[in-house]
Structures are given as C-alpha cells and as structure tokens.
C-alpha cells in the first residue's frame, strides 16, 4: 500500500482548535495538545457558568427586593408571602427593576399589598 500523508484535513482540524483558543496565554494558544485540553476546559467552564449565572442573577434580584422592602419596613420574606397571599405573582426580575428604577412605585405597591 502507498503511504498517505495526513496533510490538509489534519491541518484544518488543528487550525480550527488553535483559532478557538487564540485568546489564551502562552502555550495554551500555540501548542496543539495543550490547546486541545484548554478548549475542552473552556467549554466545561462555559457550560457551568451559564448555569451559575442564573443563580447569581436570582440572588441579586432577591437582594435588591429585600433592600427596597426593608426600607419600607417589611422583610423580603413577608413581602413575598403577601404577594402569594394576594395572588400577585410577578417575577423577581421585574420586582427588582421596579425597586431600583422606580422606588416610589415600589413603595406604593407595597403599601397597597399591606393594606388590602
């Protein structure tokens, strides 16, 4: 059998992986083996952090709602409890935006919930 030189396809594959990790430092962007490992680690980290981002934002929203509701004399826990009791189910993201951008509206909403 004749010898087959692995030229074009192998180069294309390596070039694609090296292009993916081109922003890395040192050997991680130059050497193929190290770059290949770096790529797999980068994809694992990206997947993990996409899931973590959801948790982080939820924590941020809860913190903002808690700060705004405590300024009006009610804890976050009681505020959410009153919302469920009145069946006013709005998501935490919207509540946090109202609390940050329009604090007067949040205060009025809180007073209406407490009165009724």
UniProtKB/Swiss-Prot annotation:
Record carries keyword Ribosomal protein: yes
The primary location reported for this protein is plastid
Biological process (GO) annotations held by this record are: ribosomal large subunit assembly; translation
How is this protein annotated for GO cellular component?
Answer: chloroplast; ribonucleoprotein complex; ribosome
Which domain of life does this protein belong to?
Answer: Eukaryota
Gene3D superfamilies tied to this protein: 6.10.160.10, Ribosomal protein L20
Q: Which CDD domains match?
A: Ribosomal_L20
Its localization reads: Plastid, Chloroplast
GO: which molecular function terms? rRNA binding; structural constituent of ribosome
Question: Is this entry keyworded tRNA-binding?
Answer: no
Record's InterPro entries? Ribosomal_bL20, RIBOSOMAL_L20_CS, Ribosomal_protein_bL20_C
The alphabetical list of record keywords is:
Chloroplast, Plastid, Ribonucleoprotein, Ribosomal protein, RNA-binding, rRNA-binding
Entry-linked NCBIfam families = rplT_bact
User: HAMAP family given for it?
Assistant: Ribosomal_bL20 (MF_00382)
Q: What does this protein do?
A: Binds directly to 23S ribosomal RNA and is necessary for the in vitro assembly process of the 50S ribosomal subunit. It is not involved in the protein synthesizing functions of that subunit.
Indicate the family of this protein.
Belongs to the bacterial ribosomal protein bL20 family.
Q: What is this protein called?
A: Large ribosomal subunit protein bL20c
Q: Which organism is it from?
A: Cryptomeria japonica
Q: Taxonomically, what lineage is the organism?
A: Eukaryota, Viridiplantae, Streptophyta, Embryophyta, Tracheophyta
């Amino acid at each position: 059998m004749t010898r087959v030189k692995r030229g074009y396809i192998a180069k294309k594959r390596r070039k694609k992986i090296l292009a993916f990790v081109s922003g890395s430092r040192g050997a991680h962007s130059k050497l193929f083996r190290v770059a290949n490992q770096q790529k797999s680690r980068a994809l694992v980290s990206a997947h993990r952090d996409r899931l973590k981002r959801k948790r982080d934002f939820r924590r941020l929203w809860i913190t903002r709602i808690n700060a705004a509701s405590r300024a009006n004399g009610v804890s976050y826990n009681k505020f959410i409890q009153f919302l469920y009791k009145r069946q006013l189910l709005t998501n935490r993201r919207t509540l946090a935006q109202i609390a940050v951008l329009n604090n007067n509206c949040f205060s009025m909403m809180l007073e209406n919930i407490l009165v009724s």
